[in-house]
């Protein structure tokens, strides 16, 4: 569970805020205290419009996968995956604030994992059971019904386009 602590100060926060502004998202807060973390923390940013807040975590400026579930209160419950469960993706937090994004889309009531290369629809049952694996996702570019989502993302955040 996230523990509220004093906010990080310094160059990392400045770079995160710069990236957030670049992508048109609102920087909410960055905590320095998170269960299971050393020299790490949690970032919460907000995308205006129909997209809910998303949260991702970092350790020593590396973005890490987490286990998660969407709660009735509208919050994401996050917890670190063990090394054996981790999905093998890490990216510099500073270089791309949107590299891993967990999004609940109000339009279609679906969950998506976004990064700079592709968009994955997440299996809600797996989220509810807090067991997530790439095998439980669907490459969104293969689903015709998601064109509206792609257009929205490409127009607002330039995440789709030729990167898929």
Where are these regions (language model features)?
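Charged phosphate-binding loop/patch that engages nucleotide di/tri-phosphates or the phosphate backbone
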Residues: 1, 132-164
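Acidic-basic catalytic patches of nuclease active cores, encompassing PD-(D/E)XK
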Residues: 1-45
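Short, conserved beta-strand edge motifs with alternating hydrophobic and charged residues
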Residues: 28-30, 65-68, 102
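Basic/aromatic recognition patch in beta-strand/loop cores that engages polyanionic ligands
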Residues: 45-57
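Conserved catalytic cores of phosphodiester-cleaving nucleases, focusing on short active-site segments
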Residues: 54-56, 61-73
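Mg2+/Mn2+-dependent nuclease catalytic core
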Residues: 71-91
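Nucleic-acid nuclease catalytic cores
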Residues: 90-121
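Short, electropositive alpha-helical surface patch
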Residues: 114-135
